[in-house]
Amino acid sequence: GLFGVLAKVASHVVPAIAEHFQA
């Protein structure tokens, strides 16, 4: 469902943001 898609997107977006803040 929509929540599954949202969770999948978040699981990609969150690490990307974390890399930007750590780099």
Swiss-Prot record:
The modification Alanine amide is found at residue 23. Expressed by the skin dorsal glands. One of its GO terms (cellular component) is extracellular region. Keywords: Amidation, Amphibian defense peptide, Antibiotic, Antimicrobial, Secreted. The keyword Chloroplast does not apply. It is found in: Secreted. Disulfide bonds: none annotated. GO terms for biological process: defense response to bacterium. The keyword Secreted applies. Its main location: secreted. Shows antibacterial activity against S.aureus and S.uberis. This is Maculatin-1.2.
